[in-house]
Amino acid sequence: EEAADAAWEVMELGVYSLYQDGYAKLFTEAAEHSSESIFNVEAVANPLGLGHSTDIVMRQYNSAAPLRNFIDSYWMKDGKPREESAYADSEGYADLDPRFAQTIVYPGSTWMGETVKTDNTNVRFTNKQTGFIYKKYTVYTAKVPGDQELNLGENCSPTNIMLLRYADI
């Protein structure tokens, strides 16, 4: 009851609201300090290029790859766990919660103009550890129509990391 009361107090402040421009865009530099962001870790540029390393996953190292148990924790698009879902026999990732495809690059998906392969022959990134890569907080820009290319070096993403969102309340 105490937690519910505290959540209600935050909602009644009228300061925060859900981000309306799409889940995937919420985790980009453009949406920093949006009305959904309650508490975040501020990314600060410095001459040493130090920062958080979420953008490194799109390069050769892929050191922050999501583990299989994280992938398997996504519920199905009907809002139920796989074993209770009408999509229980579904193979692949199409019937998972739509936030999955906006958060994770997975085998068979298209990213940076290429179909992600399971054999690690993609030129622009590898997925050697788990076969999956994070999209969230990854910085990229479209330099040519249909072609997305990273615009930052490793360990220097300028994107803040949201620790508490209004949706969490």
Regions found by a protein language model. Give the residues of each.
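Flexible, polar/acidic helix-loop-strand segments at domain edges
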Residues: 88-166
